[in-house]
């Protein structure tokens, strides 16, 4: 399933629904030429490309109509035409046929992930998935994963100073997270040991969110058995896991260099520079990708439909992936110029998300 944003962008009263076959054919050729070359295309070339015999003058008349509908425009540097963002959205929604992946492409993604199926961490597997996805699409690949969905294995307190300790949290997939914890005054080594034992008896196999709920309940029920300082250490440990929602999200970006390929002008280089700046805005990228967690299937944002990348004129194609229980635990996809090969990239993102879901499901 493919979701387009924003829903309802193509209004039925715009006249687009009444485009005849000739107009659609000419518009399709303009878009496909742009996606292939990034260059404006003129009426003479269009008249050679379309299936029906039309003179360049007749093609120009149709192009004028398409321009009035807001589907194409004339850049100031050329007599040819390019699709507008609105035109690209119409093409993706109404005219484009999404193809199937070739067997070679499927095998390429499967093989890359199979090679890391026994990797030390899910993060390593996702990194490999992104490397393959960016290589196949020639765009930047991104993944947003929730650390809080990792299942816990072990916790340990290591005293650093009289009133500071390092909390070492080890996950079942091998990930290790360290946080510095401020200790209540006068905590003895025995209280740290007792707190570790109490926590380890209750967190194994649970996600961070599940562990928090379990421990808050268990702490209330076990107050009579624990001395006051140990209770404070446990409470401080739980609180340290709740700090900062951005820490619960992990963003990985691969394939920046792909965006530097096939640049046609200084204007293209400036767009890529702006996109690089956007990708460094971690909070914005996380917010964008987080939108895909609320729906199944592939979502497509073209140009200014996504405020984060509006200046760089970039498109984003993203899809959620699930864990073994069928819960959405992250989002992956690609970010690139608006002239992405949508028909090819959409099934790649969809397939990669499904393979990652299968891998996480065991």
From Swiss-Prot:
Keyword Cell membrane: no
Domain of life per record: Bacteria
InterPro entries membership: GAF-like_dom_sf, HrcA, HrcA_C, WH-like_DNA-bd_sf, WH_DNA-bd_sf, WHTH_transcript_rep_HrcA_IDD
Keywords, sorted A to Z: Repressor, Stress response, Transcription, Transcription regulation
Keyword field contains Transcription: yes
GO molecular function, one term: DNA binding
GO BP field: negative regulation of DNA-templated transcription
Family: Belongs to the HrcA family.
Family annotation (PANTHER family): HEAT-INDUCIBLE TRANSCRIPTION REPRESSOR HRCA
Role this protein plays: Negative regulator of class I heat shock genes (grpE-dnaK-dnaJ and groELS operons). Prevents heat-shock induction of these operons.
HAMAP family, per database record: HrcA
Name of the protein: Heat-inducible transcription repressor HrcA
Origin species: Nitrobacter hamburgensis (strain DSM 10229 / NCIMB 13809 / X14)
